[in-house]
Amino acid sequence: MNIKMIAMAVGAAAVLAGCGTVGSDFKAPAGMQEQAFRHAPQGAASEAQLPAQWWTVFSDDTLNRLEHQALRDSPTVKAAAQRLFQAEAQLGLAKASQLPSLTLSTGVSNSRTSANTSQGIALGHRSIHGNNYSVAAGFSYELDLFGRVRRAVESADAQALAASHDRDGVLLLLSSQIATTYWQLRGLDAEMAILRGALATRKETEELVNARFNAGLSNELDTSRARIERANAEADLEEVQRQRNTLEHALAVLVGASPSSMQLEPATATDLPAPPAIPAGVPANLLAHRPDLAASVATLRATNANVGVAEGAFYPSVSLTGNFGYASESLSDISKGGSRVFSFGPLALSLPIFDGGRNQSNLTVAKARYEEAVANHEGKLLTALREVEDALSDVQQRTQQGKVQATSREAATRAYDVARARYERGISTYLDVTDAQRSALAADRAAVQINTQRMLATVSFARALGGGWQAP
């Protein structure tokens, strides 16, 4: 009868455990409204898609190889994966609290009682001695009547989800850093190609000036200027090579390789490929795909659940323990029915009465942390909007700047051709040639630098939207 009553009590408690949960259920913050960005290309919502491996839109095999190498070998990626494993393990610990704890114990002992104690005297001054063998299983279980443990599991689950998004954020940051560094390096390759061409031209010009000087058609000042221009071109080429070496070393570290092992073949083109077009009608609600915002929402959910955990401290805690096993003086008799031992209970209830305000303070802290997380999320959302607008503005303005610079580049090239032709015919001085050379070289390099910035702005746009996205 007692066993039946205990079983009924346990069953009733289990039913009650699913009836209520402390704290309030989490409600995700309102998403972004359907609105277009100020600097986005105008037009209807585009069906164009940026793949999860967003860097493939540049159609550059070397960049693709570097990105995949980084995902495989980068220590940053490995560290982020380990942080995720830790969060998932913490979730496992929290879920374990929802289940009974089972233990198995065995024991053997030899004992002898005194013959001169009251017990021994009652037995006629005899002692009791012998062996004792035992094997038993024990269990303990906290009945989650008010949902405190469920809220703790919810918090751990949200923290694991946040860690997953944080890992995605690390991957996004790393991939964007690689793309940025790579296109900076390719921009320097284009500048080096321009400088090599300029150096060859200056050598030809120096030979022309020397020939005119030897023929008495020029003066020593012109030959000195020619040597200066050639030397300046050589110095500029060495400086750009130095910058390229630095970027190459940085790329090696980003992909998880030794700086000395990275040797990218220089590109020979004097310009960069055109950046991929930004689709028109990019809606702001795509920001929900950003890993930092997704992690922020998961953190909100975790802190909201922690409020429920803190509230649960005000409610009773109910736990049940018990054991079942066998004990015998003889090992051969331990499996017999008469050797069976068991106990159920106590069904223990613990209710906080006075704690000096500890539980109330913990609840206040939990609520404040939730409100802090809400404010942080709002700040991150505004930052995300700004980053997208900045990237779109950069793309737009760099495109316009490139068009204007193309006109300047064409005019500077024409001015140099005219100045050299006039000098060869003796109509103008060599000073006009050097001025035109400098202007043409500066215009060529400026055009490459603007195109490099256009590529970097496209990378920034992809990163600002969270990398992979798909238009609704």
Annotate the PLM regions.
Residues 2-11, 16-72, 119-120, 133, ...:
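Terminal intrinsically disordered/low-complexity segments used for targeting and assembly
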Residues 25, 36, 53, 59-66, ...:
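Small/polar-residue-enriched beta-strand and adjacent coil segments characteristic
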